[in-house]
Regions:
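Short inter-helical turns and helix N-cap capping residues of alpha-solenoid HEAT/ARM repeat scaffolds
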Residues: 71-72, 106-107, 137-138, 169-171, ...
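Amphipathic alpha-helical scaffolding segments comprising HEAT/armadillo-like alpha-solenoid repeats
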Residues: 51-67, 88-103, 123-135, 154-166, ...
Length: 298
């Protein structure tokens, strides 16, 4: 009986492979093509939305209305971002709003955007308010606070920067930004914290700490903590006479739509001196290009 069944099974398998299986394959190909088209349509609609927005951006009144919306955190976030990036975003009324959101807003994204706004338009006296957010439970808030302290100079915040930077339980994205911020403080506690960060597990943290040490000392012992410390102990004046620090900025290569929207040319922020820092102590040879992230992965 088994000999009679096998030919039938083989015949059915052959029919399935010849007639039915190709249909499944073609259906699968159609599904894949459809998914690709839907994805490209979504991308194109997003690009066209950006193009439309560049023709008719929200008015200042609309941005302010969104930022002050007490019922919608997304509107608050969107409005705060628009105000922060406007030339007039540093007026006293808006500064008061940013400070209020940093201190009291319950939404972490709104708080992070307010920190970014204070970083752009704040004063040296805002450093303490910003530094408190390094103890926030939300990582995005802590990263925004650390980045803000790269732009706001106050030697009194070095203790909390050192504490966050040397805590290996802290998220590495926070410690990277802290290491960059410490590059503006030529002090023993900053140096010791940066040396400790060179020995941490994450390579990105190590490199950020080494960059700050090079800025502070004009020496480079790479990621050798022992060599850094022995050199430091042997020198009575280990730090540069002139400051080299500029807060870093981000740049990227222009894309297709950046060239199409010629009426709204894309510009990038240049590295600058943190508010509260004495610019007269800045070395004239400081090159802004050294503080730019060009966004290239080549």
């Amino acid at each position: 009986m088994r000999n009679h069944i096998l030919p039938a099974v083989k015949c059915n398998a052959k029919l399935w492979l010849v007639n039915i299986f190709p249909k499944y394959i073609s259906l699968g190909n159609i599904a894949l093509v459809a998914m690709a088209l839907m994805t490209s349509c979504d991308s194109m609609s997003s690009d066209f939305a950006n193009l439309t927005n560049s023709f008719s951006p929200p008015s200042p009144a609309q941005a302010a209305q969104w930022a002050l919306d007490p019922y919608d955190a997304e509107n608050q976030r969107r409005g705060t971002v628009l105000l922060a990036n406007a030339p007039w975003g540093g007026t006293p009324a808006y500064l008061a709003m940013y400070r209020l959101y940093v201190e009291d807003n319950a939404d972490p994204l709104v708080k992070a955007c307010a920190l970014d706004a204070l970083a752009r338009h704040g004063e040296a006296s805002d450093a303490q308010l910003v530094a408190k957010q390094l103890q926030n439970k939300n990582i995005q808030v802590k990263v925004a606070a650390a980045k803000a302290l790269q732009r706001i100079h106050d030697p009194q915040v070095t203790s909390i920067l050192c504490s966050r930077g040397t805590d290996e339980n802290e998220d590495s994205s926070v410690r990277i930004e802290v290491a960059i911020a410490l590059g503006q403080y030529a002090a023993d506690d900053s140096f010791q914290a940066l040396c400790a960060m060179i020995d941490q597990r994450e390579l990105a943290v190590n490199f950020a700490a080494n960059d700050s040490l090079r800025l502070l000392t004009d020496h480079d012992f790479a990621l050798d903590r022992r060599l850094w410390l022995s050199w430091y102990r042997a020198n009575k004046k280990p730090f540069r006479k002139e400051l080299q620090y500029l807060y870093p900025t981000y740049q990227r290569e222009k894309g297709f739509w950046d060239h199409i929207t010629f009426w709204a040319p894309l510009t990038f922020e240049k590295p600058g001196v943190p508010v509260g820092m004495d610019e007269s102590k800045l070395a004239p040879s400081t090159a802004p290009e050294d503080f730019q992230n060009l966004g290239n992965t080549k």
